[in-house]
Structures are given as C-alpha cells and as structure tokens.
C-alpha cells in the first residue's frame, strides 16, 4: 500500500534530502494524536526550496502547447531570454522571407524576371529572389536604399507594401512590449530580499513563539509589505483520506494588522503558538521528530515600478532551532542606525527555554524561571559575541581587567561594562 501511495502522490521531484514520513496522527496529522498510523520511511524533498522556487513538476497536461500558444504574450515573458531572442529573430526572418516570396511571385507573374522585357516593372530592380528578399527587408525596416521601389504598375504590389508595413509595426510593438514587460518583472528584486537560514522557537512575553527574520538589502522600500506563512504536512483524516500536503495557515497577525511590516531594517516575524496554532501540541522532542514544512512568504510592491513581488522560502522541522534567539543586527549610533548583516543568520541559545509544548505551558505543567535571568543571558550573549570579535582582530572597547579564565555564563554578579553598540531597537 505504501508503494502504491508513493507512486500516486509523488508530485515533488527528489533533488535534495527532505522530510521523512514516519508517523501520521489520525487526529490532526502532527504526530501527537493517540491513534497513529506507522508507515515506512520515505524521503521527500521540499515543496518550496530555500531560494523560493516551487519544487513541482507537471505531467500529463492535456493540450499544453495550445494553452501556452493561446497566451503567447505571457509565454514570451515567462520563458528564458535565449528562447525569447530566438522567437523574435525567427519572427523577423520569417516575415521577411514570406513577403520576399510574395514580391518574387508578383515579379514572376508580371514577367519582371525576364531581362528582355521592356515594360514597366511592378517593383523596380527586382529581377531575382535575392532582390525580392532585400526589398522585403528594406520595406519592413524602412531602410530605403533607393535602388528598389514599388511602382504604380501593379496595385497588388502597392497593397503588399502597405500590408507589410503594418505587420512590421505589429511585430515591433509586440517585441518591445514583451521585452519591457520582462525587464520590468520584479523577479530579480527577490535577490535583495532575504530570509534567515533557520527559524527559532523561544519565549517572548511569556509565550512560546515561532520566529524567523526577513531583511531588505536595498535602500529602496518595499511598499505595502506583508508576510504570510503556511504549514505543509501529510496527514490522514478521520475518514481515512490521505492528504499528501495539507496546507494550514499560520497566524502572523493578519487579524490585528501586524502582518504588515515597515521593512527598512531586518525584522523578526513572530507567530504566537496559541491554541489556534498547528504547533500548539508540539514539544521540542516532537519538533525534532516531526515531518512538516513551513512556507514563509513576503509580498509587497517594488517602489521603482509599483509592481507586486513575492519572495518565498521554507523551513523544515530540522531547521527550527528550539530555545534560540537571533543576534541583534540593528544598533543605534549618534546620528543614525546601523545594520550589521554579518549577524543576520546567527542565533544564540537561551538555556531556560521550556522544552514542553505550548499546551503544557498554558496548563501550568512547566514552571518558568525568573524573567530577569533571560535578560542577563541576553546581555551575556552579546558580551560573548563582542569578546569573540575582539579576539578576531576587532579593537576592544571594554575593560580587560577580567581574567580570561572567568566563565561569564556562571558569574551572575559580574557587572557588564558599557558597550559602544547599544541594544537592538524595538520595531
């Protein structure tokens, strides 16, 4: 049964190591139900890669070519540049050849190819196919060298000149429009929108929260920026229906409006793990053994073009660090704020993070330590980071009276010296 299901529902290509189907809970599909269906180990790739590309292949699509040709403009905009240039070059060459053949046939039927004929030609100086082809190029591109020209002898030739001029304008307009649309696509804008390599779970305001960080490497703003997230998980319903990828929304503040962000400096997106969260029943051990993928999406309008762009990434269960927080990247200077992107992906461990699920924490099954200890650990983490930077060659601005063998993590009474970089600003 497992092999049949694999062949039937394998819609994702296996290009990299992915998640493994180990245990499916009938109740909610997240490995915490009482009734579990055990299946054989199965490797599965990401649904959305780290660079944002969807790892999906479409097969057995009926009338695919006709559907793509029916929307030829979108097809030309979406294809690669090399194929786009090939299509446009072929469009020009084929149009020149077609009208060259038409003018050659007109000259042939009128007898202009006969050198002994002294009557007026339909197109002067067109006495071979090569000459007709050159006349076609000169007409469509409006070069006009002056040797070949249409006369009033043949109305058909005059009509074909007018018709070719109109066709040439249509081809030029289509090409210019497609090239401009392709150049204006905000796809490359995503190269300067970054997500942190790992997501983290830690305490914030007395509650367990799932967090990840987003940043904008350009100084130009992303207008109306907002974030979304979904959890993808295979599950079996209570009726026995197998859903390969069940998509569950993760609340990042849509109802309250905090999903809309002012992305000038890196921002940490926070999902509060409450009773409505799909992670509510998962502890650290459950996360370590879980099989799911969290897809995160950042949308907004490019300030320069006012076109909407979407940046995507994903986190597997093994890319979620429990009991970690991100290192500060925003520091306040005298007249400005400084962003240090070398710390963007770095995290530090918070030892007193509860290992239980958010449900157990809400039901008081886990006793939290004093909140002040977290503040001290936060400052010590920053102190340790600055000491590491000093050892790597960064000039030290702190006191050097402390012996090198003192463990700052165990010396709660050691006062912290003032730092040149202030705390991370709250956004």
Swiss-Prot record:
Q: Which residues lie within the membrane without crossing it?
A: 129-140, 141-147
* Keyword set includes Membrane: yes
Q: Where is this region: Disordered?
A: 384-427
What transmembrane ranges does the database entry give?
Answer: 82-106, 157-178
For molecular function, the Gene Ontology terms on record are: identical protein binding; inward rectifier potassium channel activity; phosphatidylinositol-4,5-bisphosphate binding; voltage-gated potassium channel activity involved in cardiac muscle cell action potential repolarization
* Residue numbers marked as site, Role in the control of polyamine-mediated channel gating and in the blocking by intracellular magnesium: 172
Among the record's GO biological process terms, what is one?
A: regulation of monoatomic ion transmembrane transport
Membrane topology classification: Multi-pass membrane protein
Catalysed reactions, semicolon-separated: K(+)(in) = K(+)(out)
Query: Keywords of this protein's UniProt record, alphabetized?
Result: Cell membrane, Ion channel, Ion transport, Membrane, Potassium, Potassium transport, S-nitrosylation, Transmembrane, Transmembrane helix, Transport, Voltage-gated channel
Q: State the span of motif (Selectivity filter).
A: 142-147
Any idea which residues bear S-nitrosocysteine here?
A: 76
Q: Which residues lie toward the Extracellular compartment?
A: 107-128, 148-156
Activity regulation text: Activated by phosphatidylinositol 4,5 biphosphate (PtdIns(4,5)P2).
Which InterPro entries does the record cross-reference, listed alphabetically? Answer: Ig_E-set, IRK_C, K_chnl_inward-rec_Kir, K_chnl_inward-rec_Kir2.1, K_chnl_inward-rec_Kir_cyto, K_chnl_inward-rec_Kir_N, Kir_TM
Sequence ranges on the Cytoplasmic membrane side: 1-81, 179-427
Q: What would be one Gene Ontology cellular-component term for the protein?
A: voltage-gated potassium channel complex
Q: Which intervals of the chain are annotated as region Polyphosphoinositide (PIP2)-binding? A: 181-208
After translation, the protein is modified as follows: S-nitrosylation increases the open probability and inward rectifying currents.
**Where is the protein found, in the record's own terms?**
Cell membrane; Cell membrane, Sarcolemma, T-tubule
On the tree of life, the source organism's domain of life is: Eukaryota
Q: Which family does it belong to?
A: Belongs to the inward rectifier-type potassium channel (TC 1.A.2.1) family. KCNJ2 subfamily.
Description of how the protein assembles with itself and partners: Homotetramer. Homomultimeric and heteromultimeric association with KCNJ4/Kir2.3. Can form heteromeric channels with Kir2.6/KCNJ18. Associates, via its PDZ-recognition domain, with a complex containing LIN7A, LIN7B, LIN7C, DLG1, CASK and APBA1.
Q: What does this protein do?
A: Inward rectifier potassium channels are characterized by a greater tendency to allow potassium to flow into the cell rather than out of it. Their voltage dependence is regulated by the concentration of extracellular potassium; as external potassium is raised, the voltage range of the channel opening shifts to more positive voltages. The inward rectification is mainly due to the blockage of outward current by internal magnesium. Can be blocked by extracellular barium and cesium. Probably participates in establishing action potential waveform and excitability of neuronal and muscle tissues.
Q: What is this protein called?
A: Inward rectifier potassium channel 2
């Amino acid at each position: 049964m497992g092999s049949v299901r694999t062949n039937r529902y394998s819609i994702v290509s296996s290009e990299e190591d992915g998640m493994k189907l180990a245990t499916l809970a009938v109740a909610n599909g997240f490995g915490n139900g009482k009734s579990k269906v055990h299946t054989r180990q199965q490797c599965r790739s990401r649904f959305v890669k780290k660079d944002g590309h969807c790892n999906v292949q479409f097969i057995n699509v009926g009338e695919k070519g006709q559907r793509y040709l029916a929307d030829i403009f979108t097809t030309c905009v979406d294809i690669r540049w090399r194929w786009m240039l090939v299509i446009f070059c072929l469009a020009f060459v084929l149009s020149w050849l077609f009208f060259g053949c038409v003018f050659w046939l007109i000259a042939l039927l009128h007898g202009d190819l006969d050198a002994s004929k002294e009557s007026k030609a339909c197109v002067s100086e067109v006495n071979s196919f090569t000459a007709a082809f050159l006349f076609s190029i000169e007409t469509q591109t409006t070069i006009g060298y002056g040797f070949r020209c249409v006369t009033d002898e043949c109305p058909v030739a005059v009509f074909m000149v007018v018709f070719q001029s109109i066709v040439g304008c249509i081809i030029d307009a289509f090409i210019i429009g497609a090239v401009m649309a392709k150049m204006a696509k905000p796809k490359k804008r995503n190269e300067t929108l970054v997500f942190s390599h790992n997501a983290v779970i830690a305490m914030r305001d007395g509650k367990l929260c799932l967090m990840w960080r987003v940043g904008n490497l350009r100084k130009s703003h992303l207008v109306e920026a907002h974030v979304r997230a979904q959890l993808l998980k295979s599950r079996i319903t209570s009726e026995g229906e197998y859903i390969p990828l069940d998509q569950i929304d993760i609340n990042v503040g849509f109802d309250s409006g905090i999903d809309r962000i002012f992305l000038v400096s890196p921002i940490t997106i926070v999902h509060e793990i409450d009773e409505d969260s799909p992670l509510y029943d998962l502890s650290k051990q459950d996360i370590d053994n879980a099989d799911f993928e969290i897809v995160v999406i950042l949308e907004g309008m490019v300030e320069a073009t006012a076109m909407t762009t979407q940046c995507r990434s994903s986190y597997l269960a093994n890319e979620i660090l429990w009991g970690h927080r991100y290192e500060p990247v925003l520091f306040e200077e005298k007249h400005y704020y400084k962003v240090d992107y070398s710390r963007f992906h770095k995290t530090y461990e918070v030892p007193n993070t509860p290992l239980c699920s958010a449900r157990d924490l809400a039901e008081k099954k886990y006793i939290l330590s004093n909140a002040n200890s977290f503040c001290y650990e936060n400052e010590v983490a920053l102190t340790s980071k600055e000491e590491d930077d000093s050892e790597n060659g960064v000039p030290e601005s702190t006191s050097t009276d402390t012996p090198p063998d003192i463990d700052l993590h165990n010396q709660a009474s050691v006062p912290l010296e003032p730092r040149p970089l202030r705390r991370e600003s709250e956004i």
